[in-house]
């Protein structure tokens, strides 16, 4: 039976969606095992804001978190709050916003490309995002800056919708405005993205300035006001703003030089190297084995880029609309950003979506060129990516899962809760050097006031603060034969034997061990039981 193009399109859309959702949901919360220090701090602040209306530094509903001392983007924390309210403090809960945004991005990229090309190219773009290692990996854990990938897509989607129904421009402004709270590095480029996209539409007579566009502009300006205030506060031009409903904090250390025009040639070279090698030194971002988009894909990207340049040149010369211009604006401004910062995969996350879209356009072009000579060229290319995807998935859930658990300290959540359950009133829990303090405190119930009153820093002031003690936790501390509870990472069999000879009972949670002296009358009702 011959299926119509419409039915084939729907069937392929469903299959790609199932593939993409499955890759993001399978063993969600378990792989990557453990918790990264950034997602831990974001979750810690979400819990504090949810229950006490302020973060660990005492700021009520800040537009930017103080966190490590040099700050952290806040939107991810606010998105975690309703899920924490519903499901409690668990690693899989912290990762829900990123996973959901990742899945919604599959819908968004297909819809965006379908508006500027045909359905085959749009499904190719969706497919590449669905099976691509970069996007699968970022969707499965909660690094706050990676939210910007989805919000920039949503902003563009509703911008394109706005050409047909102008009220959508307002929704586009909302998502572009929210992107400012996903990742501070995009602050310089998002207003320029909106400006260039708007000027282009006016240039090709695709829109006129109406009340909806004015409202959209004002909406975006409202989102930028806290950002401007934040900059003025941290440049010591204004005092910090603290109210019961909203705060603009003065950071302990303001990294104003993170985005700068210094060393542009070196930064551009680093960006090119990142895109060509498809990896950085961060195992949670990419792997040497599979890269970001599978190693052979960049050939298609270059082709797609050339196709777009040709179409955009014609569009500008004839003053006729072509949606490829939007992709080029976003891509070129991401390149500009890459020349202003020291890149790694997540710092330049705003570039990868457009690389994949150019890749889809390039593949579509090759299929059109060779379809008559090789009728099954589309099947061959699809099979090539599916084989790579299956290989990546096997690697991700076996070798990668084992390796990443060493970085994220798999077992840390149950280990901390167990240690709390074994602790007597007033007793301290000692933590070894291998952990970041946020990985521990995220599973504690230390209130913001208790945190401020008890925290002792080892390097204050600094961009990345470290602490020696907070409430009942003592960090950088190891067993010396005394009674107590200790959290240690990666004990060898020899280590275990030595500690057991000293009288410690050892309870193992994957990579994390809890050591305790045998004591009588241990507490029966525990945080471990409450959380579980």
Regions found by a protein language model. Give the residues of each.
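Aromatic/acidic, Gly/Pro-rich catalytic loop(s) in extracytoplasmic/lumenal soluble domains
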Residues: 455-532
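Short hydrophobic beta-strand segments
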Residues: 422-434, 482-489
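Transmembrane catalytic cores of multi-pass membrane glycosyltransferases
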Residues: 221-270
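Membrane-proximal, lumen/periplasm-facing interface regions of secretory-pathway glyco-
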Residues: 65, 375-423, 433-448, 452-468, ...
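Short, well-ordered alpha-helical microsegments
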Residues: 359, 437-438, 494-496
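Short extracytoplasmic/periplasmic juxtamembrane "stem" segments immediately C-terminal to an N-terminal membrane anchor
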Residues: 42-49, 246-251, 406-419
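Membrane-integral, polyisoprenol-dependent glycosyltransferases
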Residues: 2-236, 270-367
């Amino acid at each position: 039976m011959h299926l119509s193009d419409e039915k084939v399109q729907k069937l392929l859309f469903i299959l790609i969606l199932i593939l993409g959702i499955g890759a993001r949901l399978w063993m969600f919360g378990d792989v990557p095992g453990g918790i990264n220090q950034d997602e831990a701090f974001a979750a810690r602040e979400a819990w504090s804001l949810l229950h006490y209306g302020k973060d660990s530094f005492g700021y009520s509903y800040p537009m930017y978190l103080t966190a490590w001392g040099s700050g952290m983007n806040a939107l991810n924390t606010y998105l975690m709050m309703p899920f924490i309210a519903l499901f409690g403090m668990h690693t899989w809960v912290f990762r829900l916003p990123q996973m959901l945004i990742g899945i919604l991005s599959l819908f968004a990229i297909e819809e965006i490309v379908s508006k500027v090309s045909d359905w085959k190219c749009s499904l190719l773009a969706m497919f590449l995002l669905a099976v691509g290692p970069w996007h699968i990996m970022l969707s499965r854990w909660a690094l706050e800056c990676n939210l910007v990938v989805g919000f920039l897509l949503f902003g563009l989607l509703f911008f394109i919708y706005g050409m047909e129904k102008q009220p959508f421009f307002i929704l586009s402004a909302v998502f572009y405005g929210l992107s400012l709270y996903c990742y501070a590095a995009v602050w310089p480029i998002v207003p320029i993205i909106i400006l260039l996209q708007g000027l282009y539409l006016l240039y090709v007579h695709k829109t006129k300035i109406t009340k909806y566009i004015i409202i959209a502009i004002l909406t975006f300006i409202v989102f930028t006001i806290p950002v401007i205030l934040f900059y003025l506060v941290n440049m010591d031009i204004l005092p910090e703003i603290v109210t019961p409903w909203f705060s603009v904090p003065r950071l302990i250390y303001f990294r104003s030089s993170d985005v700068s025009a210094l060393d542009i040639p070196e930064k551009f070279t680093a960006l090119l190297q990142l895109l060509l090698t498809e990896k950085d030194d961060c195992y949670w971002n990419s792997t040497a084995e599979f890269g970001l988009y599978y190693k052979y894909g960049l050939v298609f990207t270059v082709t797609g880029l050339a196709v777009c340049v040709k179409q955009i040149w014609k569009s500008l010369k004839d003053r006729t609309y072509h949606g490829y211009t939007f992709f080029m604006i976003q891509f070129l401004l991401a390149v500009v950003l890459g020349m202003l910062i020291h890149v790694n995969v997540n710092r330049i996350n705003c570039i990868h979506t457009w690389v994949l879209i150019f890749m889809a356009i390039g593949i579509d072009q090759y299929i059109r060129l060779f379809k008559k000579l090789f009728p099954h060229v589309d099947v061959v290319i699809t099979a090539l990516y599916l084989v790579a995807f299956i290989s990546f998935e096997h690697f991700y859930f076996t070798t990668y899962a084992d390796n990443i658990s060493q970085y994220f300290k798999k077992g840390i959540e149950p280990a901390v809760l167990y240690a709390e359950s074994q602790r007597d009133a007033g007793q301290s829990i000692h933590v070894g050097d291998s952990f970041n303090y946020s990985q521990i405190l995220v599973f504690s119930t230390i209130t913001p006031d208790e945190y401020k009153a008890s925290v002792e820093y080892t390097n204050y002031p600094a961009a990345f603060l470290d602490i020696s003690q907070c409430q009942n936790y003592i960090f950088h501390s190891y067993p010396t034969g005394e009674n107590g509870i200790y959290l240690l990472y990666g004990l060898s069999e020899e280590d275990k034997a030595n500690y057991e000879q000293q009288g410690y009972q050892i309870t193992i949670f994957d990579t994390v061990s809890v050591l305790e002296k045998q004591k009588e009358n241990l507490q029966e009702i525990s945080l471990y039981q409450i959380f579980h």
